Structures are given as structure tokens and as C-alpha cells.
């Protein structure tokens, strides 16, 4: 995308959020080089941990949740899958009966995931490239967490 297209996207994403308050933009950024080496040995574990920190409280509010991620990571080396991890966290940590439906789909087949990828790119540019133009347009409508470990 050109810089102007990114600005147009950010402006439209902000307008979408302001006219649809039920939509939530949530993000988590981690400084991976500060993560201990033994944790980085299986990056899926860190990914699973980040997903739970970002989404578990939101998921716990509902009786049933359909989680539709890109199938980037499903199992950690231990064999435990992200949906199993999230489901047990909901039941045991949050003590809720939320039913988690897990439907991974490739982002090239989902406009919603493409939208999320573009939103993520705006946030990534802020933290990694020090290009904050799009992030500054969106920051008031994004709930974001930064972990430095």
C-alpha cells in the first residue's frame, strides 16, 4: 500500500469504529529480544500467551465465542493447541462456561483478517519503523498493550 492508501485506510478504520461502538480494536506489542531465550525457543508458546493476555477477558464475557485466526500457529512443541489452551484458561482461570469455537482461516480468504492485518501493520510501523502517522490517527480507538518483559 502507498503511504496515502495507508492514511485512507486508517481514517476509514477510525470512522468505522466511531460509528460502530461495539467494534473493538485490540493490539499487543512485545519486545521479543527481551523475552528469555528458553521462551523464544518455541515462539508458539509466546504467541499463545499473548493471545490469552489480549483476548481472554473479552472472551469470558460471552456464552459462546468464535475465534477466527490465521492458522499461523496452532500447536506448540508440547502438543497443546491454542484453542485447548484458551478453553482451559476460560474454564479454570476465568471460571466461566464460555464455549470456544475455533475456526482458523487463511487471511487471503477472509476480508476481516485482511483488515486486521492492515490494522496490525499500522501499529507495527509505529513501534518498529518509527512511522507513527497511521498509529496516531488510530490510537484513540485502539486498546493496546505493550510488553517489554
Regions found by a protein language model. Name each.
Residues 1-149:
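Phosphate-ester processing/binding pockets and catalytic centers
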Amino acid at each position: 500500500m502507498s503511504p496515502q492508501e495507508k492514511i485512507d485506510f486508517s481514517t476509514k478504520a477510525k470512522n468505522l469504529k466511531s460509528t460502530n461502538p461495539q467494534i473493538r480494536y485490540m493490539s499487543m506489542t512485545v519486545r521479543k529480544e527481551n523475552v528469555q531465550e528458553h521462551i523464544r525457543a518455541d515462539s508458539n508458546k509466546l504467541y499463545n500467551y499473548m493471545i490469552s493476555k489480549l483476548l481472554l477477558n473479552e472472551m469470558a464475557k460471552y456464552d459462546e465465542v468464535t475465534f477466527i485466526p490465521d492458522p499461523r500457529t496452532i500447536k506448540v512443541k508440547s502438543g497443546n493447541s491454542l484453542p485447548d489452551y484458551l478453553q482451559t484458561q476460560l474454564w479454570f482461570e476465568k471460571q466461566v462456561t464460555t464455549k470456544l469455537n475455533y475456526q482458523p482461516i487463511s487471511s487471503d480468504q477472509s476480508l476481516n483478517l485482511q483488515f486486521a492485518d492492515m490494522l496490525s501493520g499500522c501499529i507495527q510501523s509505529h513501534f518498529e519503523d518509527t512511522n507513527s502517522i497511521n498509529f496516531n490517527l488510530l490510537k484513540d480507538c485502539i486498546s493496546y498493550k505493550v510488553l517489554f518483559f
